[in-house]
């Protein structure tokens, strides 16, 4: 299906690009989340009329993400979990737990924005975690997992 992107989409294209994607990806994700529209002649003409407005909105989102990124980058957050004597956790710290921790600290972060390269944290200690605030703004934070010996 040919679509026109209404915002930058990672691994796909930038605002205004006309790309071909699988029908299911367009119908189930891109179009419902208002990231794209079908690339009909009418839609392309309407997009060209609204292009400046959409670019302004995209620039505002990027500026807001960069402002939050400057505050968040390099910070350390602590979370306490039950652990054994050997330092392994009973359970794990997931991206949902990290997102909840950041929300309590006053940041508007969703679970999907937290990237954990090594997967869920299963040991006590400091671990690096990435937070994708925007497709162009990814910051690194440190999560210090403190063991609560059972």
Curated annotation (Swiss-Prot):
GO molecular function: rRNA binding; structural constituent of ribosome
Keyword Transferase tagged: no
An individual GO BP term: translation
Classification via SUPFAM superfamilies: L9 N-domain-like, Ribosomal protein L9 C-domain
Cellular component aspect of the GO annotation: ribonucleoprotein complex; ribosome
Keywords from the named record: Ribonucleoprotein, Ribosomal protein, RNA-binding, rRNA-binding
Entry keyword annotation includes RNA-binding: yes
A Pfam family of this chain: Ribosomal_L9_N
Family: Belongs to the bacterial ribosomal protein bL9 family.
Summary of the function given for this chain in its UniProt record: Binds to the 23S rRNA.
Stored PANTHER family: 50S RIBOSOMAL PROTEIN L9
Name recorded for this polypeptide: Large ribosomal subunit protein bL9
UniProt organism field: Burkholderia mallei (strain ATCC 23344)
Gene (name only): rplI
